[in-house]
Amino acid sequence: MNNFVFYSPTEFVFGKNTEVQVGALARKYGAQKVMIVYGGGSVVRSGLLDRVKQSLQEAGVAYCEMGGVQPNPIDGKVYEGIQLCRREQVDMMLPVGGGSVIDTAKAIAAGALYDGDFWDFFIGRAKVEKALKVAVVLTIPAAGSEGSGNTVITKTETLQKLGLCAPEHLRPVFSIMNPELTYTLPAYQTACGIADIMAHIMERYFTNTPYVEISDRLCEGTLTAIIKEAYRVKQQPDNYAARANIMWCGTVAHNGTCGVGREEDWASHALEHEISAIYNVAHGAGLAVIFTAWMAFMAEHNPAQIAQFAHRVFDIPKSEDLEEMALAGTARLKHFFRYMGLPVSFKELGIEHPDIDRMLVSLQRNKGELLGNYVKLTMTDCREIYRLAL
């Protein structure tokens, strides 16, 4: 196990009707004026936005708002939000939604207190040294942004989809999580969220770091739980227990708990970011395609941890042939994704002829010559993984 620092100060308020506490919590954390950030009309139609506003009013917290955040969030809304934030003298960001909304709010929180272009943070030209506080009302379990210091934004001019990690400044001070708010999610969106959650765990799980049994078991237990609950929610979309477990899995998957003391990989996310940046597909769907291709590649090149995953998560019998075990586990994961209605190939994703050369040029520009840690991938390796996903 490697040395580590684990810092996770977010206050999670979980359960039915918890959104009505948002005003009191915002006041508790010193907010005078918040910016509510949201996406489409669902938070309006459901009455959630009105409940949030009423709670803020009752607590004496002023607010302004910005809607229209799209999936795979773009830089344009961040620039718009920064201007609004400064004009309205906001001191706390309050995203009401899923990962795209939260990530947009985090980028605004960092950019509002920075004299330059917020994109400087994403390309490594500047480091986040201060930011507005961020608080969350979560409606879509997937990205885990409600408990992480991460944000991912796409720059439309260059189609660069890049991430930023600044946990000291961008991890939410509190997150409200009511599983009932997820009842009305379409089945495909629920499935994409589950794939995203699983990918966050697997990026941490597939490691060469020895003697990490406790975090191995945390990863495996969380994966096993979410697979079980996914089957249940597929049949019973309004099952509170299933929705609650999936929502909490999303947080545990990405708040750092599963990755302590171990070298993480993150190659699959980088490979997928090129797909969703260029083709604007759902991130979770892209991950279902890429992760199974990545695992098939690793079955040949470094099968040990893939084989352990196959045995402990999907009950594949132990064998001396680790590659065979790894491929069997990958096949079971593909079967699960397909059952959930997810694609496991570019064709199923709706991309008949992916421009692999274009993706590789962008990938190399964004990430350099080598990718990941489980196996250091060259651009030739990355081409092969994209090819395996055809």
Task: Give the positions of each predicted feature.
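A glycine/threonine-rich phosphate-anchoring loop and its flanking beta-alpha core
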Residues: 113-211, 308
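Conserved beta-strand elements of the Class I
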Residues: 35-36, 92-94, 135
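C-terminal charged capping/lid subdomain of soluble metabolic enzymes
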Residues: 306, 313-390
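N-terminal small/polar loop signature for handling phosphorylated ligands or for N-terminal nucleophile
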Residues: 44-116, 232-243
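Active-site segments that bind and position negatively charged phosphate/pyrophosphate groups
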Residues: 204, 208-332
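Short glycine/serine/threonine-rich phosphate/pyrophosphate-binding segments
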Residues: 19-22, 45-48, 75-76, 100-106, ...
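N-terminal amphipathic/basic leader segments beginning at the initiator methionine
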Residues: 1-29
